[in-house]
Amino acid sequence: MIIMNGPWVEKYRPQKLDDIVGQEHIIPRLKRYVEEKSMPNLMFTGPAGVGKTTAALALAREILGEYWRQNFLELNASDARGIDTVRTSIKNFCRLKPVGAPFRIIFLDEVDNMTKDAQHALRREMEMYTKTSSFILSCNYSSKIIDPIQSRCAIFRFLPLKGHQIIKRLEYIAEKENLEYEAHALETIVYFAEGDLRKAINLLQSAASLGEKITESSIYDVVSRARPKDVRKMIKTILDGKFMEARDMLREIMVLQGISGEDMVTQIYQELSRLAMEGEVDGDRYVGLIDAIGEYDFRIREGANPRIQLEALLARFLEHA
């Protein structure tokens, strides 16, 4: 019996900058701020699950020292995106003098979800309290942040983690939790995580909760996604000009494996890209197919019937057979 003790993403969150997985182009620069006991306003941008929040917390611990909790404020812009958040929580925190530290740090996560008005209010607070506080802003898309804020920050672009980096971390957690696992199961987790370590750890914990040895099958039991080999076979079948056979494969995948339309389109894109990288789909054909995938992905997300749209997508693939 596997005994769960809270979310593993928190249990195994690195506490020091040196322990952060990946981001070798960023960590040395952050460590210099620790050495200097000084830092400008920072912006961490990049996809989910790549270490932005972990880096902010580790930096705060190391640069603020013993009293880091008293001098650190964390807010999530997705929970409260209005101007009130900026004018109350941030303003009240910034007005207080640092306690046993050179300055205070405000970490605002998912700041790209703030309204433009809230961002302009934030910019004014950043200007007002430069002597006593520094900001760390985290976002997925820096393009959604107004220029006056970007110009006031040192920008760090976090990259998706590589497969071997994720596997190494999963192996570490599995050892600590005394898990039995197949090596191929971890590779399957990496496939579905797509560079997102948080997603990978959550998948590992979900599979472990089944209380058995972690196998490729147990990963599919918790992930609710199609098996890559089935999607790849369907793509090859339609590109061979066999529409009815490919359509039957599509229906079987969606019905028997319970795959949503959006997930199906995503996996078709992933497997087609892998086929192109392996040289099984030439460049010109790949361009046309990707254009079709983008069109039908949009239609499904706008509410069109997924089954009909996916069969229509196969028909478009037939044009490139």
UniProtKB/Swiss-Prot annotation:
GO BP annotations listed: DNA repair; DNA-templated DNA replication
Keyword set includes Nucleotide-binding: yes
Protein's UniProt name: Replication factor C small subunit
Oligomer and partners: Heterohexamer composed of four small subunits (RfcS) and two large subunits (RfcL).
Taxonomic source organism: Methanothermobacter thermautotrophicus (strain ATCC 29096 / DSM 1053 / JCM 10044 / NBRC 100330 / Delta H)
InterPro entries with a match to the protein in the record: AAA+_ATPase, ATPase_AAA_core, DNA_pol3_clamp-load_cplx_C, DNA_Rep/Repair_Clamp_Loader, P-loop_NTPase, Rep_factor-C_ssu_arc, Rep_factorC_C, RFC_lid
Function per UniProt: Part of the RFC clamp loader complex which loads the PCNA sliding clamp onto DNA. The complex possesses DNA-dependent ATPase activity which is further stimulated by PCNA. In conjunction with PCNA stimulates DNA synthesis by PolB, relieving inhibition by replication protein A (RPA).
Top-rank taxon: Archaea
Keyword Nucleus: no
NCBIfam families named in the record: PRK00440.1
Family named by the database record: Belongs to the activator 1 small subunits family. RfcS subfamily.
SMART domains: AAA
Gene: rfcS
Disulfide bonds: none
Binding, ATP: G46, P47, A48, G49, V50, G51, K52, T53
